[in-house]
């Protein structure tokens, strides 16, 4: 039934239609849900699962990540004479801005094991968060980071502190859990991660390419080099692998958005992983992702310079290239905008 109101002259008038509610930005929803998921997993990890890192490391990692992100954004705003992206929307704007740093910090802390030394973890968090400001490329007309922040921080730490630290041991993710609870943990992680990637980040094709490529490389290594098939495939059954698949490699800010490109990206990581394994290089998951992201960034820079040279050769009547400085002065927004990272990515 249509509601009416009585006008002053006695005529019936229809009230103005209600304002349609603006739909929430899916990128913000992805960041928020990733942050909630990784925070909850940290809490459960220290209380129920058996995480062996000191629980204060998570707090220190968050403080380090927040401080690094705010410092670099303040410096960038001063250098390019613009307002810092975390200002302008009050506490809500600051909260949205810090979501990527929150995800990245917790992911680095969760996946690195440095015994009782926090400094390597702190170094990894600083490298991860600062990489979004340092390692950038002209992507679709604006400067954006191309290295997966959490993955890069972990990879650099494993290279610099190879004698001190390692990846968190796989048993840590279910050490205190009972037999049936251990079966429940990967199901929950797999279900929640799949829902996030299917509905918000739209990275299902990437997961298919990565999982399919990983499965194929195990069979290829078995047939050609005699690698034990059950050993090569057993990696896919671990909780750490599921976390990596759903929360790190699918980082929206550093992975392709088109399904075909996503599939190629995921398959490429699996291929590089197989090469690293045959070269007896450990921590292949993280190094493979860093290598593929680095080549993707070099590809963007190569495409930019080729177009620039073509534009210069075309003369005044040719196509006009955007000045790099102008592109750099318009960075992607971090809160609900383009500077999406999880762990940035959300990563765990």
Model-derived regions, located:
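Structural signature of hydrophobic alpha-helical transmembrane segments
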Residues: 53-64, 114-126, 171-186, 229-240
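Membrane-embedded alpha-helical segments in integral membrane proteins
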Residues: 16-18, 34-52, 69-70, 103-112, ...
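Alpha-helical transmembrane segments in multi-pass membrane proteins
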Residues: 37, 57-69, 73, 100-108, ...
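N-terminal signal-anchor module of multipass membrane proteins
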Residues: 2-81, 85-86
């Amino acid at each position: 039934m249509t509601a009416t109101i009585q006008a002053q002259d006695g005529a019936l008038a229809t009230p103005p239609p209600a304002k349609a509610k603006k739909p929430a930005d899916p990128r913000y929803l992805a960041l928020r849900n990733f942050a909630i998921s990784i925070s909850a997993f940290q809490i459960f990890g220290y209380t129920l699962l058996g995480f062996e890192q000191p629980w204060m490391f998570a707090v220190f990692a968050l403080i380090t990540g927040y401080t690094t992100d705010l410092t670099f954004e303040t410096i960038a705003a001063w250098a390019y004479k613009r307002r810092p992206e975390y200002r302008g929307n009050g506490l809500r704007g600051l909260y949205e801005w810090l979501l990527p740093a929150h995800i990245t910090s917790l992911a680095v802390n969760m996946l690195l094991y440095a015994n009782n030394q926090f400094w390597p973890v702190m170094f990894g968090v600083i490298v991860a968060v600062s990489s979004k400001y340092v390692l950038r490329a002209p992507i679709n007309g604006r400067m954006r980071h191309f290295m997966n922040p959490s993955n890069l921080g972990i990879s650099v730490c494993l290279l610099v502190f190879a004698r001190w630290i390692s990846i968190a041991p796989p048993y840590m993710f279910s050490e205190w859990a009972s037999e049936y609870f251990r079966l429940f943990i990967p199901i929950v992680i797999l279900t929640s991660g799949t829902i996030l990637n299917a509905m918000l980040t739209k990275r299902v094709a990437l997961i298919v390419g990565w999982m399919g490529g990983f499965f194929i490389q195990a069979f290829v290594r078995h047939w050609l080099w005699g690698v034990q098939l059950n050993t090569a495939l057993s990696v896919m059954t671990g909780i750490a692998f599921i976390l990596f698949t759903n929360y790190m490699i699918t980082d929206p800010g550093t992975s392709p958005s088109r399904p075909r490109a996503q599939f190629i990206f995921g398959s490429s990581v699996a291929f590089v992983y197989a090469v690293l394994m045959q070269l007896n290089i450990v921590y292949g998951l993280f190094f493979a992702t860093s290598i593929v992201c680095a080549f993707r960034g070099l590809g963007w820079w190569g495409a930019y310079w080729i177009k620039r040279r073509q534009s210069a050769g075309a003369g005044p009547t040719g196509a006009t290239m955007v000045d790099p400085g102008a592109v750099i002065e318009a960075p992607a927004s971090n809160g609900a905008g383009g500077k999406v990272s999880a762990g940035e990515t959300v990563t765990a």
